[in-house]
Amino acid sequence: MADLGAEDKLKQICDALRIETLKPAEDEADAIVRNAKEQAKRIIDEAQERAAQIIASAKEEADFKLRQGESALAQAGKRSLESLKQAVENKVFKESLAEWLDNALADPEVSAKLVAALIQAIEDKGISGDLTAYIGKHVATRTVNEFLGKTILAKLRGKGVAVGSFVGGVQLKVEDKNWVLDLSSDTLLDLLMRYLQKDFREMIFQGS
């Protein structure tokens, strides 16, 4: 039961830290959406024109078919419009967000701050163990170590950070418990997509 309690604490730490990483992202969200909206305008215009044609054609067919009790074509038009919206969302919004996130996480100081925050968080929860900190594979370990300083480095296995298999962000592993606190770029992108997706849809597709 003690291990279960510790695992619950670990989950709470991960959730709390991930929420903290969303705060600066919220400040960036408006700029991301504005940029995405500019990039998406041409695609959206074409998509809406195409969707309108599909729906108009479907409705014409449906007027006839409905007399026979069939409405499948009208529904197909609506599904086509939704598919086009999703294509724009994935192409423009996700790519813009991923680019911003990659740029932010490429900064060695950001990686150092994330590592320090994770270590401080587990210490505050009374969790201890042999720690390994992994950073993105394109971030310089020496620079991150310099930002961390001797006090924090002394708490890490090998007295420094290691290179992970992910692009950006960090992971902290409690070796003896085989726990991993994951703030890697893929994890953060997934969280940000879910956090900002509704606002993006409302702004881009308003009235469509």
Curated annotation (Swiss-Prot):
- The organism's superkingdom is given as Bacteria
Protein task: Produces ATP from ADP in the presence of a proton gradient across the membrane.
Output this protein's name.
V-type ATP synthase subunit E
Task: Look up keyword Disulfide bond and say if it applies.
Answer: no
The protein's organism comes out as Chlamydia felis (strain Fe/C-56) (Chlamydophila felis)
- Asked if Transit peptide is a keyword of the record, the answer is no
The UniProt entry's GO biological process terms, in alphabetical order, are: proton motive force-driven plasma membrane ATP synthesis
Q: Which InterPro entries match?
A: ATPase_V1_Esu, T3SS_HrpE/ATPase_suE
Q: Which family, according to UniProt? A: Belongs to the V-ATPase E subunit family.
Cite the GO molecular-function annotations of the record. Answer: ATP binding; proton-transporting ATP synthase activity, rotational mechanism; proton-transporting ATPase activity, rotational mechanism
**What keywords were assigned to this record?**
ATP synthesis, Hydrogen ion transport, Ion transport, Transport
Please provide, in alphabetical order, the Gene Ontology terms of the cellular component aspect for this entry: proton-transporting two-sector ATPase complex, catalytic domain
